[in-house]
Amino acid sequence: MPKQECLNTWFLRYIAEYSITQTDKGWRWKFDDNMFSSLERLFGYKFEFSCPALFIHGKNSLLMSGNILTNIKEMYSGIMDFNEVANAAHHVPLDKPLEVIDIIKNRLF
């Protein structure tokens, strides 16, 4: 995952306390980092939703640079809306937690 600064230390502390686990090989994330080695199987996959969908992304996200976001929008703009959050990197809730809540609330209500 891309490295980014975070001013919300309470959020970082929560992640540190609940998202890592100690193993016989040391400390590790609780998710399976091997999943990133096979993401190419999703390229060209056409997701279908039977409900409204919203893609929230940070304007400064390294993973949304280049043609990545353009390609995602081309492929899915017919079935989902896109919301860019200014001054946020890849992990949008870390940078702008209240803005993410507002975006979701405005979408739902």
Regions found by a protein language model. Give the residues of each.
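Helix-rich cap/lid subdomain of alpha/beta-hydrolase
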Residues: 1-24, 28-33
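Conserved serine/cysteine hydrolase catalytic core
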Residues: 20-75, 81-84
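Catalytic histidine-centered segment of alpha/beta-hydrolase-like enzymes
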Residues: 82-101
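C-terminal alpha-helix
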Residues: 103-108
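Secondary-structure boundary motif
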Residues: 3, 74-78, 109
